Amino acid sequence: MASKNYDDVLKGKYPAKEHARRVVEVIRSSQPDVSGVLYLEGQKTKMIEDNDSEEHFRQRRYFYYLTGCELPDCYLTYDIATSRSTLYIPPVDPESVIWSGLPMSALEALQKYDVDEVRYTHEVNAALTSLAEAAPSSTVYAIPNQVSDSITFLGFGAKNFDVLKPAIERARVVKSDYEIALIAKANDISGAAHLAVLKRVRHVSNERELYATFLAECISRGAPHMAYHSIVAAGRAAATLHYVKNDEPTAGKLNLLLDAACELNCYASDITRTFPISGSFTPESRAIYDTVLRMQLETLAMLKEGVRWDDVHIHAHRVAIEGLLAAGIFKKGFSVDEILESRTSVAFFPHGLGHYLGMDTHDTGGNANYQDKDSMFRYLRVRGTLPAGSVITVEPGIYFCNFIIEPYLKDEKHSKYIDAAVLDKYWDVGGVRIEDNVVITKDGYDNLTTAVKDAKEMEKIISSS
């Protein structure tokens, strides 16, 4: 689904009941006779320690997936036999109304959310007992450590705390049209914010000014929450993958790496762009940028339903090696295959090519193996084949991080491939990463990210602003 179509999709309700049916089907794949009730609790209101103010509220993603409800202190029951979904919301607290106004009513919640019934939270135990009495041998499925002490589950034949959480995680991999629409809209908002930073980068003196520009643009477009802490990294700071200081001077530095994106109604976007602060790439920066862009374009061309993500990641390393050979950082005379086999390219591209994206920036279902003895795959967050309907980031990068590269320079196994004298010309490049968000389709992919990444176009925007 192209991003331009998202407004029509988002006119409807978040498809919570469709998601509940998906979860039941996942459970049924291993338990054909599944019966009973799915039980979930939303995030509770929490107070800041030693303070009378509430913590920032963030809904539990497992609860949101089956409700679309962003209210705190709620519960959900889903009767598998009848496919009946009931949301329980807090009743009116007169003292709270003084400060916060009237809360959403049960009728308003029923009109807003894709559920069959809305009741109040003091009714949940009675409702659970009634569901259990209707099917005495049935099971209640819940998530461990997410059941309040006041909840009894009396009358159920069994309590299962093992299957619901992984079932939701599996179901979340393939997105509904509504979910894709939310991610697409978040991408468009984030893309506009990236453009605002491009237009301002030449006129600021500190990273924090660009950080503020990005936040302001997202908030003004209706997305006040970021999907993750923004990375606004000038110069050599861009070699730190998750740099979060965002308060260093920009003067005298070559490039800015901006990894920043908003979330919309609990759904994340995740975009990275790298561009010259002055408006013109240096030859060294342009060589690395072109290599990273080719890494992305060639791996994007491989994407379709059933592609093995490990293979796509390996190809990104091949292109990186070709680019580093062309730049002279890897010594001539060695083959791409030989350098690939040595894993020396991991010094410059140490992370995985991408990750699933959804309600979490690093979304569920990736089956990563962080104990993999092969350094090329240790931080690959998705393993195996990609299903149609999944949303994944494609974010190759090349970095010049002294802390990471120095051990390779001291190890003959790797140092024989690296020309240290040429490498010295590239430290100020810092790091280059380019990241888009794509939906996997049967025969290819749909790129949801609209932020500009053509080198000449970025230079033109910066120089003319």
UniProtKB/Swiss-Prot annotation:
Q: What is this protein called?
A: Probable Xaa-Pro aminopeptidase PEPP
Q: Which residues bind Mn(2+) 2?
A: D259, D270, E435
* SMART domains linked: AMP_N
Q: Which UniProt keywords are present, listed alphabetically?
A: Aminopeptidase, Hydrolase, Manganese, Metal-binding, Metalloprotease, Protease
Q: What is its EC number?
A: 3.4.11.9
Q: Which Gene3D superfamilies match?
A: Creatinase/methionine aminopeptidase superfamily, Creatinase/prolidase N-terminal domain
Q: Which Pfam families match?
A: AMP_N (PF05195), Peptidase_M24 (PF00557)
Positions contributing to Mn(2+) 1 binding: D270, E395, E435
Any Gene Ontology biological process: proteolysis
Query: Which InterPro entries does the UniProt entry name for this protein?
Result: Aminopep_P_N (IPR007865), Creatin/AminoP/Spt16_N (IPR029149), Creatinase/aminopeptidase-like (IPR036005), Pept_M24 (IPR000994), X-Pro_dipept-like (IPR052433)
What's its job?
Catalyzes the removal of a penultimate prolyl residue from the N-termini of peptides.
Its catalytic activity?
Release of any N-terminal amino acid, including proline, that is linked to proline, even from a dipeptide or tripeptide
The free-text note explaining how the cofactor binds reads: Binds 2 manganese ions per subunit.
User: What cofactors are annotated for this protein?
Assistant: Mn(2+)
Give GO MF terms, alphabetically.
manganese ion binding; metalloaminopeptidase activity
Q: Which family does it belong to?
A: Belongs to the peptidase M24B family.
